[in-house]
């Protein structure tokens, strides 16, 4: 919950900056940080999310996994699976954006697979799902998300 709150603050700050200095249509490509740099990855995911907001007006829901080198990785992974699964089960309203990203791209794809199980076809129309990961995981995640009717966006972390 803290992460979402801090993201909302970061997003609000970015919105204020945009009013002062409009961003070019051709936004600069963001470069993914080193695989094990947890703090830099959090900032990177927030920046990519802001660039991909589109018409989404609500603060996005960010699901992030720490690097696999984190000694508590498995526990953090299990908690995020539970959190994302519960959120999907409650339903996601149109106009919202879900952001999934991690240097542990394959594990994030596993998390998305678990969270989206049981989601009714076309029940997420008007929802934007952003996956930030490795190109090798894109097709798998897209095949999981597409039946829900959500708008799927992939950004390669490179």
Predicted regions and their residues:
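Bacterial signal peptide processing site
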Residues: 14-17
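General marker for long, soluble alpha-helical cores
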Residues: 47, 51-56, 64
């Amino acid at each position: 919950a803290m992460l979402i709150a801090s993201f909302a603050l970061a997003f609000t700050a970015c919105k204020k900056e945009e009013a002062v200095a409009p961003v070019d249509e051709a936004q600069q490509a963001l470069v993914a940080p080193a695989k094990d740099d947890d703090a830099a990855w959090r900032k990177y995911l927030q920046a990519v999310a802001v660039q991909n907001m589109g018409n989404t007006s609500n603060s996005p829901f960010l699901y992030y996994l720490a690097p696999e080198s984190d000694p508590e990785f498995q526990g953090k992974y299990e908690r995020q699976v539970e959190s994302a699964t519960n959120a999907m089960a409650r339903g996601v309203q149109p106009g919202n954006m879900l952001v999934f990203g991690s240097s542990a791209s394959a594990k994030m794809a596993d998390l998305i697979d678990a969270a989206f199980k049981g989601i009714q076809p076309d029940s997420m129309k008007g929802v934007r799902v952003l996956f930030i990961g490795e190109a090798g995981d894109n097709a798998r995640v897209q095949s999981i998300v597409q039946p829900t009717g959500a708008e799927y966006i992939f950004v390669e972390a490179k």
